[in-house]
Amino acid sequence: MKIAALITGKRVETISSSATLHDLVNALNVHHIGALVVSPDGKKIEGIVSERDVVRAMPGKLDEITDMRVRDLMTQDVITCTPTSTVAELMTVMTERRIRHIPVVDESGNLISIVSIGDVVKAHISDLDSERKALSDYLKS
């Protein structure tokens, strides 16, 4: 299955690198998501920041975190995929790199969506179920 099938109609939330930690936590909570793409315009990707990044910033820095900016927490070397990437490819990358979110970009590198590990697992289960059904139908004939 191609990633294009997973992103149809899916909105991607972004945040500015100058946003505060408070803004970040609020956006994650309001949108019920685990990561935001860091972008100045909703197209160019500067980084990605997740709830895990927030948790990792806390130990020993509780007095400092209120002044932190998204740029202080985000991952700048962002792994991306395209709509033509496959679910199997993303499963491999996400497992090997231990990441939960991958932005989807067009041929110009502009952000068009984001895929989570949950999206990938659901698609993989759907693929397996379709394969199981096809094999079952074949054996019945």
Predicted regions: what they are:
Residues 2-17, 38-45, 106:
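Short, charged helix-to-loop "capping" segments that act as catalytic/coupling loops
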Residues 1-10, 50-95, 117-141:
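Tandem CBS (Bateman) regulatory domains
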Residues 15-32, 38-40, 80-98, 105:
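The conserved cystathionine-beta-synthase
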Residues 1-3, 20-21, 33-36, 53-57, ...:
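Short acidic/polar alpha-helix capping motifs at helix-coil junctions
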Residues 28-31, 36-53, 94, 102-118:
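A glycine-centered beta-loop-beta connector
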